[in-house]
């Protein structure tokens, strides 16, 4: 007899917002979502700030969202941990950071700092760079070179000059530090093995072959004149006495989110790197704020805090089968992040990875691989052996990042079509679905004056539970979704999962 599956369906980057202006969620024709919304119990929950372990007012993101969802509790994020360590002064006593700087002093070499230069708070925060500069000053380091990656995605598209000016003011205040290279994140922070992009950033960082400008500001302004926004600034070298990353130097990469920092780190700190021909740096001390992946030989500044009793582990302990399914862009989120930072499958878990389309930007193909994800899931459901499904549709977020309204509307409409087939199939099997999101984005893709808005939002996300006859609590947070799943599965909630089921009892 076929099992009755319970599914968590995450519409990535899909939140509630009253105004229709620039709101693809409201403007899209989504008959299936609306049908479930009108028929079944609904509520909305918080997906940003303190509710997900981020600083107050900080927008959520997919990594944080899936970590909180899977853990069933508030998970204090790297950003919050690092901020706290700087405030407490522990940061300046950190062994790894002090060893990194001791390496510079003992080799009479240079300190290179890599990172995304913005206050977006998704991958990094430039105030962490300032703390590193203060530490270097205290320890008497003379040669400090900043390799800045420009954002324009988690912050305004053309905001780089503000961060550059503030950083240069910090250089002047401390009497150390200068920009050595500048790259748009499109090049320096790829995550899809597009090595031809990373190679451009690498060449600028190593001071090999890249355009050169007298100042960081001059290079960015020249890029603006060519019609480029921050994200797409072609890597360039800033003229100074720096001759790139050399033998005996130290690199500290201050991005705390791994997925877009891993590839560049592999080029420098993975001896087996094969993406393109590189000249290895000898005796390089390479430190990263968090662990990016197992291939990178790096000292870790902030070690991971282990999370036990995530939704996947509880399913395993109760002999339940589970499926994790998404396309490439969100596959790490339904696996690694949903499992609290664990790569290995649980017993009874299987995974389906559907390739994301190879296009320059997803507004060119708003449906992405949603139909293929849907087909793969229907195939899995037909096996009749699943207890728990965790599914992510990437489109509202990935297309929302383009800041283009029409493609984002199309993205949501494609997802809605797939949602209808999937949920109806689950209902036919006497199963349940929770339809929700991990953070906002597509709910606002234009600013009030019609400029593209490519960032996430702090708006609450909807929750639909396809079980008639129950009432949902009026508010909650992402950490309440796993307890709600356990409630539907009739599985006891362990003590360290401190969220509460959204179903009133």
From Swiss-Prot:
Example GO biological process: glycolytic process
Residues annotated to bind Mn(2+) 1: 397, 401, 456
Subunit comment: Monomer.
UniProt GO molecular function: manganese ion binding; phosphoglycerate mutase activity
Keywords: Glycolysis, Isomerase, Manganese, Metal-binding
SUPFAM superfamilies the record matches: 2,3-Bisphosphoglycerate-independent phosphoglycerate mutase, substrate-binding domain, Alkaline phosphatase-like
Cofactor binding mode and count: Binds 2 manganese ions per subunit.
One Gene Ontology CC term in the entry: cytosol
Catalytic residues in the record: 62
Keyword Manganese: yes
Catalytic function, reaction form: (2R)-2-phosphoglycerate = (2R)-3-phosphoglycerate
InterPro entries the UniProt entry points to: Alkaline_phosphatase_core_sf, BPG-indep_PGM_N, Metalloenzyme, PGAM_B_sf, Pgm_bpd_ind
Pfam families associated with the record: iPGM_N, Metalloenzyme
Annotated pathway: Carbohydrate degradation; glycolysis; pyruvate from D-glyceraldehyde 3-phosphate: step 3/5
CDD domains (alphabetical): iPGM
Cofactor field: Mn(2+)
Family: Belongs to the BPG-independent phosphoglycerate mutase family.
Its biological purpose: Catalyzes the interconversion of 2-phosphoglycerate and 3-phosphoglycerate.
PANTHER family in UniProt: 2,3-BISPHOSPHOGLYCERATE-INDEPENDENT PHOSPHOGLYCERATE MUTASE
Native organism: Staphylococcus aureus (strain Mu50 / ATCC 700699)
Gene this chain is encoded by: gpmI
Protein name per the record: 2,3-bisphosphoglycerate-independent phosphoglycerate mutase
Record-listed E.C. numbers: 5.4.2.12
Keyword set includes Ribosomal protein: no
